[in-house]
């Protein structure tokens, strides 16, 4: 048995119920476990296509399962389904079964999943005055600041605090993906999150999942 990511990790009261002892380090371990699984699928030329938290079952931070694998894209069989928040701008609104996904499309979904594990359950394009997610994705209207660069629509409260506590090298890459459309390979995320885990272990950064103030 295990817990569906969407209804355990991504809902704060349920996160505290199912994983009461988890800290940032556990969610980074979980991210690394998922990324290593995705990387090995990519090496076998399999694209998940509909990567999303409803299709990931968490047994522990080191053991996860993908479900709905019948929609995986294998060779010339397209993945016929998708999820708005995990669909990159260039294929928003397209008929999923009418084309083949590329790894570049999947790298967008991977970055979204990483973001939503770092800020548990918060999609990257949700913002104050929240307009339509698909529209925000198409415009790449990303609301989390990088230095002075901001659209001043960052969601209030805990989300701002979590973002402020992330190391610059992670914020920089997330900003690059969601504002500048520069995606990185799965192996690069593995390197960045391994570095983050190391920095957490040194006590340089907060291990709280929901810090209550800015860094």
PLM region descriptions:
Residues 1-30, 76:
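Conserved structural core of kinase catalytic domains
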Residues 38, 42-59:
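Catalytic-loop of the protein kinase fold
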Residues 54-94:
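Activation segment/activation loop of eukaryotic-type protein kinase catalytic domains
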Residues 91-104:
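Conserved end of the kinase activation segment
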Residues 105-117:
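A conserved short alpha-helix in the C-terminal lobe
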Residues 114-168:
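Conserved C-lobe activation region of Hanks-type protein kinase-like domains
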Residues 124, 165-171, 177-188:
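A conserved short helix/loop substructure at the end of the activation segment
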Residues 190-194, 198-215:
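Regulatory extensions appended to serine/threonine kinase catalytic cores
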């Amino acid at each position: 048995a295990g817990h569906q990511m969407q209804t355990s990790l991504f809902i704060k009261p349920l996160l505290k119920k199912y994983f009461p002892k988890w800290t940032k380090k556990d969610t980074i371990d979980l991210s690394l476990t998922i990324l290593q699984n995705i990387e090995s699928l990519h090496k076998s030329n399999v694209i998940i296509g509909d990567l999303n938290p409803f299709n990931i079952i968490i047994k522990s931070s080191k053991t996860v399962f993908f479900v709905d694998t019948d929609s995986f894209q294998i060779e010339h069989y397209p993945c016929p389904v998708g999820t708005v928040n995990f669909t990159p701008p260039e294929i928003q609104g397209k008929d999923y079964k009418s084309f083949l996904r590329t790894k570049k499309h999947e790298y967008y979904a991977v970055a979204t999943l990483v973001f939503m594990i770092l800020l548990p359950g918060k999609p990257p394009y949700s913002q104050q005055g929240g307009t339509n997610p698909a529209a925000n994705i198409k415009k790449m209207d990303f609301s989390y600041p990088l230095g002075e660069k901001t659209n001043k629509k960052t969601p209030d409260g805990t989300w701002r605090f979590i973002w402020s506590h992330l190391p610059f090298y992670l914020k920089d890459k997330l900003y690059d993906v969601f504002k500048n459309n520069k995606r990185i390979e799965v192996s690069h995320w593995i390197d960045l999150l391994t570095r983050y885990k190391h920095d957490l272990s040194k006590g340089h950064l907060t291990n709280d999942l929901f810090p209550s103030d800015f860094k």
